[in-house]
């Protein structure tokens, strides 16, 4: 916290989270997709957002690459920068969930501690950790951006899964098999959202 924090006061507003959720017709939550590069995080999150949008659900997808074009464009890939990247995304996701949106985030977010901090910021009742579990060998075969090839050749350092660690979730709320069809995974997630009374249809 900064030194001037004693002069910064939280202001409550008359429009509550519950009122916003009532307007949207569903709860505001954060769906946090985590997994290796190439695991299918962004693909599944994008397909789920499309399915929710077709059902009239208010959503927003925060993608790991996209936020580095603006919100996090000043950050690199050191451990400190990765931590700050996730902290910023967590803050934005929390604000969007407060606005009543279903926020989908697709980030490697390799460290458990960082994901836990986001969970605490968002609130345990509004944070759903979704682990897209895809074997490293499959991720390397997919390699949509050619990053694994560069990492194996020594052209890309500190790459998660090769020379930087990925800490898989101990007990994610959702554990997806990243080798399954995307349509099957989306169906599983829609069922979960219905069971938890996050969406109605």
Curated annotation (Swiss-Prot):
Pathway: Sulfur metabolism; hydrogen sulfide biosynthesis; sulfite from sulfate: step 2/3. GO terms for molecular function: adenylylsulfate kinase activity; ATP binding. InterPro entries: APS_kinase (IPR002891), P-loop_NTPase (IPR027417). Keywords: ATP-binding, Kinase, Nucleotide-binding, Phosphoprotein, Transferase. The active site is at residue 109. It holds the Pfam family APS_kinase. ATP binds at residues 35-42. It is an enzyme of class 2 (transferase). Belongs to the APS kinase family. This is Adenylyl-sulfate kinase. It comes from Salmonella typhimurium (strain LT2 / SGSC1412 / ATCC 700720). The lineage of its organism: Bacteria, Pseudomonadati, Pseudomonadota, Gammaproteobacteria, Enterobacterales.
């Amino acid at each position: 916290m900064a030194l001037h924090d004693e002069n910064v006061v939280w202001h409550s507003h008359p429009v509550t989270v519950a009122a916003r959720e009532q307007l949207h017709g569903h709860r505001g939550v954060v769906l946090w997709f985590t997994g290796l590069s190439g695991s299918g995080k962004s693909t599944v999150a994008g397909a789920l957002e499309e399915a929710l949008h077709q059902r009239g659900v208010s959503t927003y997808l925060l993608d790991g690459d996209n936020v580095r074009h603006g919100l996090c464009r000043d950050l690199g890939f050191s451990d400190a920068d990765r931590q700050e990247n996730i902290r910023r995304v967590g803050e934005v996701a929390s604000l969007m969930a407060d606005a009543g949106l279903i926020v989908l985030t697709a980030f490697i977010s390799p460290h458990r501690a960082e994901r836990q901090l986001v969970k605490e910021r968002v609130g345990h009742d509004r944070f759903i950790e979704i682990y897209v579990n895809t074997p490293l060998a499959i991720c390397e075969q997919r390699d949509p951006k050619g990053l694994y090839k560069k990492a194996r050749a020594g052209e890309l350092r500190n790459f998660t899964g090769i020379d930087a660690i990925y800490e898989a979730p101990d007990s994610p709320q959702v554990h997806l098999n990243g080798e399954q069809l995307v349509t099957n995974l989306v169906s599983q997630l829609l069922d979960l959202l219905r069971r938890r009374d996050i969406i109605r249809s």
